[in-house]
């Protein structure tokens, strides 16, 4: 999914690509909260109930297997929507880093935003149980999803390309673009040409399988 999400971000441009990614992710997060209501609506036809009402309706249904199957299917769908948005987040972040940092600073800047996921993983066991206990488990999904929409607002008004950003000075722009300036001044500079590798050819390398195995073993927990 990262492969196609990266191409999608390139096609849309960084700002729009990240907006789509965080928007879809936020919708997916909020959808989890409504799985109970959707389950009661699909099985009983009663859609106009709140979170508490859906719990009561589901608890009175005798066919437990049907309830479980529908609920699990809805959660899988919500997780799929969440994953589509999540897949676009990392390519957009890398693209933003490439736009705002010269090559020598990109590794450090990438480590900063990548550490955000670790901070979130540490904060989740503290905050999510408190929200779920105080307001119900549904609100833990809605609040987290709503924070994504809040971040979208900051992104719309605060981000722009360095050459168009009003708060980027000429000195800062020159620092950001130092690699382009240095390359253009090289005598006999020849742009690097690379050949494209097809998606299928990637599976011919043992490094691909090693990476895939590592992701398979860790991403389920992560």
Q: Where do the PLM segments sit?
A:
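Helix-to-loop junctions at the C-terminal end of transmembrane segments
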Residues: 2-13
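C-terminal ends and interior cores of transmembrane alpha-helices
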Residues: 23-68
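MFS 12-TM fold signature
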Residues: 22-32, 82, 147-151
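Cytoplasmic helix-loop-helix junction between adjacent transmembrane helices
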Residues: 78-117
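Helix-loop-helix hairpin linking two adjacent transmembrane segments in secondary transporters
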Residues: 118-166
